């Protein structure tokens, strides 16, 4: 499966647009991470616990989006993007989305 942020895939043309596909996940902070983060913000620098949590969330959202595209029989997802939002205090949603398409080699 090809995933690209562009609207075209070099060497291919879009044969059919199958529709918008998405995958999301809501992750919450962990109390231990919050305590460590509070100390880290005083000293400055990367908060590795949150970085790891967001990386995991992006990977889960991407995987879910790809599964949705595969169910439609897509060869690729074009116009791929991530979005994030705060759902409630201490919880964030990561959304992966794009357009599922069938490709034809040119």
Swiss-Prot record:
One Pfam assignment: YbjQ_1
SUPFAM superfamilies in the cross-refs: YbjQ-like
Disulfide pairings: none
Family stated for the protein in its record: Belongs to the UPF0145 family.
PANTHER family: UPF0145 PROTEIN SCO3412, UPF0145 PROTEIN YBJQ
HAMAP family: UPF0145
Name used for this protein in its record: UPF0145 protein TM_0763
Gene source species: Thermotoga maritima (strain ATCC 43589 / DSM 3109 / JCM 10099 / NBRC 100826 / MSB8)
